[in-house]
Amino acid sequence: MGARASVLSGGKLDAWEKIRLRPGGKKKYRLKHLVWASRELERFALNPGLLETSDGCKQIIGQLQPAIRTGSEELRSLFNTVATLYCVHERIEVKDTKEALEKMEEEQNKSKNKKAQQAAADAGNNSQVSQNYPIVQNLQGQMVHQAISPRTLNAWVKVIEEKAFSPEVIPMFSALSEGATPQDLNTMLNTVGGHQAAMQMLKETINEEAAEWDRLHPVHAGPIAPGQMREPRGSDIAGTTSTLQEQIAWMTSNPPIPVGEIYKRWIILGLNKIVRMYSPVSILDIRQGPKEPFRDYVDRFYKTLRAEQASQEVKGWMTETLLVQNANPDCKTILKALGPQATLEEMMTACQGVGGPSHKARVLAEAMSQATNSAAAVMMQRGNFKGPRKTIKCFNCGKEGHIAKNCRAPRRKGCWKCGKEGHQLKDCTERQANFLGKIWPSHKGRPGNFLQSRPEPTAPPAESFGFGEEITPSQKQEQKDKELYPSTALKSLFGNDPLLQ
């Protein structure tokens, strides 16, 4: 502890112990705070010996300050302690930690102003003119043009061959053509061998923009004053009716006319149309597959979004809405739980395992568990659920645990239902009756649940007065059946039988 507490001594230690932790608070800094700061610096892999000097404290502050906003409370406390110690080393009188932070911020602002003034002085003393490629100043002070390098042209051709006209071609063209003249831009376009249909579309866009420029910038009537340059027309900006010297003069005049930047904007506008033609997929059609990782889906989404010709506000709305809406059900459930304010990093972290083997196994297990539970519930509701099986019973001896086929007792004679001999169980007349209350088969006639007689359709009978009528055999059978089976007619079940009326 002695080595750690030896950071301050004498008057500095007295000044340290007079500073309050909080404005208006009672607690003040003590030696234990220096010991704690030394241990924290070791934990953050910083040298605790830096606390002994003001320069060392300044180095520690420079390391800790970028992480203050996202750091923990311990990191902020360490930063406040080192800032207060810096004021003690510099013999700046402060009353509390808040005042020490304000003093330190003032010192940092003064240091920044000094550096800015020094940089401005160095720039003023430097007599060399800035070299803005491809237009540079030679030793005689003249503005000359350096032709675009073959390496740049080779990089541009390689991008077109590999990427065709995908969305990343536009920023690549913008980077390679930085500060180029219209002649340089035409050289880059002429090196494109294939894709002549796209080049023709680009020429049409350039011609349209040149005509619009001529309409908005009409030529002034009268002769041009001596020493003045003519104003560029649309064809001059496109490099078809202007020389390289005129282009350099326009770009370096006071005030300058940036013909190269204007022509570059026209080309980028045409490239946007070509990219949209070569990327026919709409952002509305980008949907995550059921087994596609969320990272691959996000890559496809933003690649298609770059090709969309829309404002930044519209693209922001597409990102907030469609990215979640077009995700698969698993990821969509997770993303909706995160809320609308979730960052892309949080989304990708939350959906990192979706679609992998472990996630598939977990989803399959949950689905099988739900299916099993639902099937069991349906069986219980329908009454199909069978409880424990009933104990079998022997028909021969009447004991449980075996059937008559395996029974060791003497075989019982006669019917197993009524016990009488002369017939078997299947022919026993003491079995359960049918729904009309009669045993079937009967010895004669139709089954009990059928009509016992069926009238045959005949012509109407002749009038009879009952003299000498003969009773036919069929009528005798009908009367006999009525006496034997009085309850088998439909009248006994459903009221009056129309066939018997």
UniProtKB/Swiss-Prot annotation:
Cysteine pairs bridged by disulfides in the record: none
Stretches the record annotates as Interaction with membrane phosphatidylinositol 4,5-bisphosphate and RNA: 14-33
Keyword annotations of the record: AIDS, Capsid protein, Host cell membrane, Host cytoplasm, Host endosome, Host membrane, Host nucleus, Host-virus interaction, Lipoprotein, Membrane, Metal-binding, Methylation, Myristate, Phosphoprotein, Repeat, RNA-binding, Viral budding, Viral budding via the host ESCRT complexes, Viral nucleoprotein, Viral release from host cell, Virion, Zinc, Zinc-finger
Chain intervals for the UniProt region annotation (Interaction with host PPIA/CYPA and NUP153): 190-228
Chain positions covered by the region annotation Dimerization/Multimerization of capsid protein p24: 278-364
Database matches in PROSITE patterns: ZF_CCHC
Span of zinc fingers (CCHC-type): 392-409, 413-430
Residues bearing the modification Asymmetric dimethylarginine: 389, 411
Region (Interaction with membrane phosphatidylinositol 4,5-bisphosphate): 73-77
Segments carrying motif PTAP/PSAP motif: 457-460
Keyword Zinc-finger among UniProt keywords: yes
Lipidated residues (N-myristoyl glycine): 2
Record PTM text: Gag-Pol polyprotein: Specific enzymatic cleavages by the viral protease yield mature proteins.
Sequence segments annotated as region (Interaction with host AP3D1): 12-19
Positions of region (Interaction with Gp41): 7-31
Biased composition (Low complexity): 116-128
Region (Interaction with host CALM1): 8-43
Gene3D superfamilies tied to this protein: 1.10.1200.30, 6.10.250.390, Human Immunodeficiency Virus Type 1 Capsid Protein, Immunodeficiency lentiviruses, gag gene matrix protein p17, Single helix bin, Zinc finger, CCHC-type
InterPro entries: Gag_p24_C, Gag_p6, Lentvrl_matrix_N, Matrix_HIV/RSV_N, Primate_lentivir_Gag_pol-like, Retrov_capsid_C, Retrov_capsid_N, Retrovr_matrix
Note on domains (UniProt): Late-budding domains (L domains) are short sequence motifs essential for viral particle budding. They recruit proteins of the host ESCRT machinery (Endosomal Sorting Complex Required for Transport) or ESCRT-associated proteins. p6-gag contains two L domains: a PTAP/PSAP motif, which interacts with the UEV domain of TSG101 and a LYPX(n)L motif which interacts with PDCD6IP/AIP1.
Family from the record: Belongs to the primate lentivirus group gag polyprotein family.
UniProt name for this protein: Gag polyprotein
Species of provenance: Human immunodeficiency virus type 1 group M subtype D (isolate Z2/CDC-Z34)
Gene encoding the protein: gag
